[in-house]
Amino acid sequence: MPPKEEEEIPVPQRPPSPPPHTTFGVRGILPPTFSAFKPRDYRMPSPQAMNHVAWSCDGKKLAAVGIDKITRVWQPEKGMEARSATMFSGGHSDEVDHVTWNPTHPELFCTSSGKDRRIVFWDARQSRCLQQVSLKQSPLVMNYSPDGKTMVYTSAGHQMYFLECGQVQGGKETWSVRDKEIVSGSRAMFNHTGDGIVLTHHSEHTLRVLDYPSLTVRETPAAHVGGCEAAALDPRGRYLASGGFDSIVNLFDLTEWICARTITACEHQISSLSFSHDGEYLAIGSTGVYVDICATETSMPLHRVPALAPAPTVTWHPSRYVIAYCGQTKAREGGPAPVAVVSLFGALE
């Protein structure tokens, strides 16, 4: 029998009542009935974890990586069975760690592997990769600029680097390494206008906001005790959410760079954050076997989604109330072998 604490998912504590003007009722918003949905878990036998999932910009495709050298892409409205995935292989010589989609084109995506030190660019309409970029560092996390022409990535050595897309002879677009000042950081992402970068570091208690392309430090708000692991930008441009080892999520006002509110629903280290398309809801992945959904404007916990495994990645669909997340079940003595998992929660219809 597994320990009792692994059988039961704790109920998140409710914070004090929020100001009335921030509530859904006063603002005329009818939230989804999250408790009516059930997680849909898709298991794949594997000794490795599925560690990253990402939606295409139109929400029609979902990519997952982590268990091998292959990137799997589903069209969730048609099915999420393993056999229904389109397989993209041949770009990497070792396990793929991360995948991200071009924000301006629903068929273009890229993958990275820390072991083979490559970032590979793909077109979902073709089986072969468009380009392989070999690096001197092991890439960990990548993010496109809003125009899809620049890539920021962080390395296993916790440093930030850039790739740029340019035209070569014949009009073909090619990505190449851009030489810039090396800045330390564990995760980096562009702001919505592309003129700034949000940078977190696993061993620093502050966030850093840099101007781009100068990389001048603009803001350094204190965020977490013991390091910051996750960050997400509100699509409305109001808030920056950050999560760290202290199990707390902070919401920073992007106008004044003060902490507008704090979410304390989680009992575990925060690993991933994602805002819904309208910015009203925040999904929180952690080292616990659940995903929390909280209201952005009140920080109130709305629903705790039971998960088969801790979720290293959670991500909302770009236009619907659907969350994708992934992970790997734990090995139990006398129990079944661990399996990789990709899960969906919400209504795709």
Positions of the model-derived regions?
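WD40-repeat beta-propeller superdomains and closely related acidic/aromatic-rich repeat-like regions
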Residues: 2-349
